[in-house]
Amino acid sequence: MENKKTIYFLCTGNSCRSQMAEAWGKQYLGDKWNVYSAGIEAHGVNPNAIKAMNEVNIDITNQTSDIIDANILNRADLVVTLCSHADSVCPSTPPHVNRVHWGFDDPAGKEWSEFQRVRDEIGERIKCFSETGE
């Protein structure tokens, strides 16, 4: 089924939030959506994001930290910004691309429990989207 839609998760560094969103997206949306993530910059995948996702049996060790790809951005059906910085500085999207903002706290540099909380919040949000389309 190659009539999949494309969802593109964006945050500042493509290190934590968007990496987790990509993983949850593949889990909950993978049969209907091509799921990608990127950042305004590429900071590398945060080891605590890898560890947090491992706790829920999702392996993101092979995910890469990438800057926004104009080709994916321009052909995406849905672009989701995950932080206010990405929302404000994200390159403009064409009129046919639906763009929404789902804000989540940045766990980088914070306590371990923050990674777990943000991971769970992102997972719940994407699960809800998979069930309701919103």
Swiss-Prot record:
Keyword Cytoplasm: yes
Keywords: Arsenical resistance, Cytoplasm, Disulfide bond, Oxidoreductase, Redox-active center
Cell compartments where the protein resides: Cytoplasm
Coiled-coil positions: none
Gene Ontology MF term list: arsenate reductase (thioredoxin) activity; protein tyrosine phosphatase activity
Chemical reaction(s) catalysed: arsenate + [thioredoxin]-dithiol + H(+) = arsenite + [thioredoxin]-disulfide + H2O
EC number in record: 1.20.4.4
SMART domains on file: LMWPc
Keyword hit for Disulfide bond: yes
Disulfide bridge positions per record: 11-83, 83-90
Catalytic center residues: 11, 83, 90
Pfam families per UniProt: LMWPc
GO cellular component: cytoplasm
GO biological process, one term: response to arsenic-containing substance
Known function: Catalyzes the reduction of arsenate [As(V)] to arsenite [As(III)].
Family of the protein in this entry: Belongs to the low molecular weight phosphotyrosine protein phosphatase family. Thioredoxin-coupled ArsC subfamily.
PANTHER family named among the record's database cross-references: ARSENATE REDUCTASE
Protein's name in the database: Arsenate reductase
